């Protein structure tokens, strides 16, 4: 698009014309610099959602957001495990527990997240209750990763310019592309990702962005609507490896995992969810353990790259995840993370 104005971009979207990555990067720059009005931000977000986002459009927006972010460099191969949220299922913190397990199994995890938006207890909320200092400055967050192979990037500290979109997003009160950019804008730019997405239409789009970046990833959605691999039914999985995307459906029964009920995975307030984390790390069997190990296995598979059979890869990684819990390594990992983050905070 030769002339970039809000009028031209929004008109194109309303006509059903897809924008280029440069167009949407320009739009995000206008938003993140505080130059866009609330009406322009809202109009753009709704027009894009109504047309349906493309890979190029989302890639441009994510790049524009990263251009305005506080980024960090964590040495070595890194992994993010996160869900977009928005499924309104109010489950326990599956991806948070899976992150701890994956790190205990040998991955270096850089988790990027925020407080609860659509649930009662977000990643930041439960980690804080467990004793992790969630708002370390970037240098200390990197140091914690180097020391214990897991760290947390509290989104508001790394994406301060996102405040300019807060009011129109809040007033719209419907999902837009902003709800899906978090997993694509981890400030550490991890080399692998395991991403749960509540909107099926966005799964392939987000997988396409990872493919264009050359990042190994698993993007998935429970066929019950969860933004994680579910154990209540099958899940849809988009496998990103070597710059290409392929789709598979996963049935946890093929791994010997019994069907769970939605109620068995439901969480509560921060006290309840923190207790669930502790019980899981202490080795409590049941549906929560099954779901967490499955998602940890997916994360470990993403970190290594899935080039062959998904089910066989997950089978091996599931055993690896189970061993990390049963040996006490996962519980020790959380304790080490708490200790390292608190030590850094005391130095401030």
Swiss-Prot record:
Binding site for Mg(2+) 1: 95, 228
Xref: SUPFAM superfamilies: Nucleoside phosphorylase/phosphoribosyltransferase catalytic domain, Nucleoside phosphorylase/phosphoribosyltransferase N-terminal domain
GO biological process: L-tryptophan biosynthetic process
Record-listed 5-phospho-alpha-D-ribose 1-diphosphate binding positions: 83, 86-87, 91, 93-96, 111-119, 123
EC id: 2.4.2.18
Gene3D superfamilies listed in its UniProt record: Nucleoside phosphorylase/phosphoribosyltransferase catalytic domain (3.40.1030.10), Transferase, Pyrimidine Nucleoside Phosphorylase, Chain C (1.20.970.10)
Record: residues binding anthranilate 2: 169
Pathway linked to the protein: Amino-acid biosynthesis; L-tryptophan biosynthesis; L-tryptophan from chorismate: step 2/5
Gene Ontology molecular-function annotations: anthranilate phosphoribosyltransferase activity; magnesium ion binding
Role description: Catalyzes the transfer of the phosphoribosyl group of 5-phosphorylribose-1-pyrophosphate (PRPP) to anthranilate to yield N-(5'-phosphoribosyl)-anthranilate (PRA).
Name of this chain's protein: Anthranilate phosphoribosyltransferase
Gene: trpD
């Amino acid at each position: 698009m030769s002339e970039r104005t809000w009028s031209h971009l929004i008109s194109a979207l309303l006509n059903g014309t897809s924008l280029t990555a440069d167009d949407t990067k320009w739009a995000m720059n206008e938003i993140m610099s505080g130059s866009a009005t609330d009406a322009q931000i809202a109009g753009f977000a709704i027009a894009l959602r109504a047309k349906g986002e493309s890979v190029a459009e989302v890639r441009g927006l994510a790049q524009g957001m990263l251009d305005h972010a506080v980024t960090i460099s964590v040495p070595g191969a890194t992994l993010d495990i996160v869900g977009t949220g928005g499924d309104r299922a109010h489950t326990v913190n599956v991806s948070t527990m899976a992150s701890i397990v994956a790190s205990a199994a040998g991955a270096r995890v850089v988790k990027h997240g925020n407080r609860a938006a659509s649930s009662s207890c977000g990643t930041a909320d439960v980690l804080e209750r467990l004793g992790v200092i969630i708002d370390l400055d970037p240098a200390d967050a990197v140091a914690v990763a180097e020391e214990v192979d897991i760290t947390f990037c509290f989104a508001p500290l790394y994406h301060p310019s996102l405040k300019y979109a807060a009011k129109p997003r809040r007033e719209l009160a419907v999902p837009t592309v902003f709800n899906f950019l978090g997993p694509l804008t981890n400030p550490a730019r991890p080399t692998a990702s395991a991403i749960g997405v509540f909107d099926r239409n966005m799964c392939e789009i987000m997988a396409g962005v990872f493919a264009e970046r050359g990042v190994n990833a698993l993007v998935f959605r429970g066929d019950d609507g969860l933004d994680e691999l579910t154990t209540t039914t099958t899940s849809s999985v988009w496998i990103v490896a070597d710059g290409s995307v392929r789709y598979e459906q996963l049935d946890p029964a093929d791994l010997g995992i019994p069907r769970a009920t939605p109620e068995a995975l439901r969480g509560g307030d921060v006290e309840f969810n923190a207790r669930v984390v502790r019980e899981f790390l202490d080795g409590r069997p049941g549906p929560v353990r099954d779901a967490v190990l499955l998602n940890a296995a997916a994360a470990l598979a993403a970190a290594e790259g899935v080039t062959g059979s998904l089910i066989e890869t997950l089978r091996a990684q599931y055993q690896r995840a189970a061993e990390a819990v049963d040996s006490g390594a996962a519980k020790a990992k959380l304790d080490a993370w708490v200790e390292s983050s608190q030590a850094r905070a005391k130095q401030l």
